[in-house]
């Protein structure tokens, strides 16, 4: 799973996610992408589950880019522990995602295959997302 090699601080504030993504909102690498429509934290496990769903569906053809990285430590206290006594220990890593952010990109696969692969990944993520394509590319069957 993804996590930083080293960080400046062990624990982070919870914070709130305001506004839309200032950067990372356009396709930079692939022809198809998965774009976030809601703000939320996405954990390293969720990113890995989505990555596996995509790679298993495209059967290792094409190229996949993960455009988000879990760089925020999320801490929690153990169950049935009284309030106080400081902040809990870091439990997992998460990425803060704003609406409009591209989460994954795919290239080298047909549009319909990319769409189905991204739909499999959508089920693994806690936010609403949509499939986007470069100008001139189609994610639907030609009829």
UniProtKB/Swiss-Prot annotation:
What ranges does the record give for the region Disordered, renumbered to this chain?
Answer: 1-21
Task: Write out the GO MF terms.
Answer: rRNA binding; structural constituent of ribosome; tRNA binding
GO CC, sorted alphabetically, is: cytosolic large ribosomal subunit
Q: List the keywords (alphabetical).
A: Ribonucleoprotein, Ribosomal protein, RNA-binding, rRNA-binding, tRNA-binding
Cite a single Pfam family from the UniProt record: Ribosomal_L16
InterPro entries with a match to the protein in the record: Ribosomal_uL16, Ribosomal_uL16_bact-type, Ribosomal_uL16_CS, Ribosomal_uL16_dom, Ribosomal_uL16_sf
Q: Its domain of life?
A: Bacteria
Is the keyword tRNA-binding assigned to this protein?
yes
Report whether RNA-binding shows up as a keyword of the record: yes
User: What Gene Ontology terms for biological process does this UniProt record contain?
Assistant: translation
Which regions are flagged for Basic residues bias? Answer: 1-17
Please state the span of the N-terminal signal peptide per the UniProt entry: none
Q: Which PROSITE patterns match?
A: RIBOSOMAL_L16_1 (PS00586), RIBOSOMAL_L16_2 (PS00701)
Query: Cystine bridges: which residues?
Result: none
Assembly and interaction partners:
Part of the 50S ribosomal subunit.
UniProt-listed HAMAP family: Ribosomal_uL16
**NCBIfam families in alphabetical order:** rplP_bact
Reported function: Binds 23S rRNA and is also seen to make contacts with the A and possibly P site tRNAs.
The family classification in the record reads: Belongs to the universal ribosomal protein uL16 family.
Instruction: Return the protein name.
Output: Large ribosomal subunit protein uL16
């Amino acid at each position: 799973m993804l996590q930083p090699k080293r960080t400046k601080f062990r624990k982070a504030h919870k914070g709130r996610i305001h506004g839309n993504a200032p950067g990372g909102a356009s396709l930079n690498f692939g022809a198809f992408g998965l774009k976030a429509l809601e703000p939320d934290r996405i954990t390293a496990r969720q990113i890995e589950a989505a990555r596996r769903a995509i790679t298993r569906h495209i059967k290792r053809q094409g190229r996949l880019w993960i455009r988000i990285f879990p760089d925020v430590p999320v801490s929690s206290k153990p169950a049935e522990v009284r309030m106080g006594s400081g902040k809990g220990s870091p439990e997992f890593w998460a990425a803060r995602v704003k609406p409009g952010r591209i989460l994954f990109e795919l290239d080298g696969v047909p549009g319909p295959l990319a769409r189905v692969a991204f739909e499999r990944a959508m089920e693994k993520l806690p936010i609403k997302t949509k499939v986007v394509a470069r100008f001139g590319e189609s994610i639907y069957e030609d009829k």
